[in-house]
Structures are given as structure tokens and as C-alpha cells.
Amino acid sequence: MEEVINGILIREVETKNIMTKSSLPVGGYSVNPYVGCTHACKYCYASFMKRFTGHKGEWGTFLDVKHWPEIKNPKKYAGQRVVIGSVTDGYNPQEEQFRNTRKLLEQLIGSDADILICTKSDLVVRDIDLLKNLGRVTVSWSINTLDENFKNDMDSASSIERRITAMKQVYDAGIRTVCFVSPVFPGITDFEAIFERVKDQCDLFWLENLNLRGGFKKTIMDYIAEKYPDLVPLYDEIYNKHNRSYFEALEVKAEAMAKKYDCPFVDNEMPYGRVPQGHPVIVDYFYHEEIRGTENTGKRNR
């Protein structure tokens, strides 16, 4: 069945298995209750998924709502990391109607899986009741700016303020939270300012560089030329000449920030547990495509 709802083409599809083995450095399983994402982020690495869908519209203009057989043996995933939203956002606006992510969480209760939810939405607070019953669960919000105008240029997801408010609600409910500063836009993202806003309501503070490839490289480079012309030489140096010195300097800056605030500083690790308030683990995830590992503790190839 297909229909257009609020300008988005909605298609309901059947899938044999909602759980997919993950190739991400964080490992485990990837679970995506939808195909497509209506947040329509201009830098979305998952936009490559369009070619597998048969959709002709642009990424962000369609959403496939998955139907899957009920997970009958959730204990099968005990001890495994389960990432919800690796190539979609399980809390896109349409989740309010279709409730696929809530259904998935209900089926995972009692699994003893290490669940990681990745989102840019505040809708996740609706499911705090389920999250508290899931045991090892982490909710991660992508926040790469405090400038709502820049955010609106890049995506149509919840405002930054709504994300920060949702993070505090989930954190105060006793659920582990992550501020995922991703992607870090050179010359635009001020991760120290973001850290100041969220350090008392997150357990991990992840940093990931902007990685330009595929069709969206031109989109972003054209945007920088139009809105931030003074940054064109920097972006040319990083993304055309492949100079890493900018992000190498940011790594040094991040480590210094960790020392200043007495925070652990790690390289692509996701240790479980709550941390003393105001001292989140700062995670260096720059150039993560070089990271390969087992048991979710991949190390960078240096």
C-alpha cells in the first residue's frame, strides 16, 4: 500500500527479519524499523540506501514502514549490542502514527541486549516507560551545533533545544545518554560550547568528523561556498587535498578538554554504565572508517 501523508510518500513493506548483523565499529546488530528518513539531513551517509528501494523521489521524501514477524526469542540477543537507527531514525515524525519503534522495544523486553538508540528527535521521551524496563539501554542524540539556523539548513528534525530537553528527561529517568557531536563541521561546529550545555545530562560525549563522499559532497561544498565563503579554503584543504591537520588539532583540543573537566578520554570505546554527573566519557570517533575491531572495542589503525 502506498499513500502520501503530509507530503511524504508512505509505503508499507514486509520484511522477513528485522534484526541484521552490523558491520559498524560498535558491532552487534542493526535494527531499522523504517527504510528512508524524513529528517532529510543534507549530509546523510545513509542516503545511498535509496538505490535499493525503487523510490524515484529524493532521500527524505519517502518512508517505507516495515512489518516483520514478532521476535519470539529475544534472549537470543543477550549480551549483544543492538543499534536501533543505523540508517534511519526510529523516531522520525511518522513514528508517532505507526509506532514501529515502540513495537520493537516491546519485543526486546527481557532480551538482556545492550540497546543503543540513535536519534535526532524528542519523541523518544514517549517511550521512557519501556526504556526503564529494558535494562542496558543507551539513547544518543546527534547535536553538532547550537545554531538553530544552521541546523535548519541541514535537517528538518527536532530543534536543538528540544533534543537537549529530551536528553535531560531521559538522563533524569536513570537512562544512559549520549551527546553525539556528529558530524563536526570544520569552522562551524563548536564542540566545547555544546559540551558546556550537555555535560551534566550525558554519560558519553562522542566526536565524529564530517565525512564527505558520494552525492552529498557537492551539496555540502556548494552550501559552504554560499553561506560560509571564508571557509572554502579550509574545506578544499580537508576534502579535496585530504589534509588531516584540522581534525588532528581537534583531537588534541578534545583531549585537553577532557583533562580540564576530569573526563575519561577514549578512542572508539563505549564502556557501559553511568558516570559522575558533569564528567562524561569523551569519545574520539574521528575517521571512524579506519576503525575495525571485535567485541565492540575496535582500535584505530595507526
Regions found by a protein language model. Name each.
Residues 156, 168-189, 240-244:
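Conserved strand-turn element in the central/C-terminal portion of the radical SAM core barrel
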Residues 1-138, 146-149, 160-161, 165, ...:
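Conserved Radical SAM active-site core
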Residues 133-139, 199-204:
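Glycine-enriched alpha-helix->loop->beta-strand junction motifs that scaffold or abut catalytic
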Residues 29, 82, 115, 139-141, ...:
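Hydrophobic faces of well-ordered beta-strands that scaffold small-molecule active sites
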Residues 120, 142, 266-270:
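Conserved beta-strand termini and adjacent loop/short-helix elements that scaffold enzyme active sites
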Residues 2-14, 192-302:
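Auxiliary Fe-S-binding modules of radical SAM enzymes
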Residues 109, 171-172, 199, 259:
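Anion (oxyanion) recognition and catalysis
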Residues 83-92, 122-125, 137-157, 186, ...:
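Conserved radical SAM core fold
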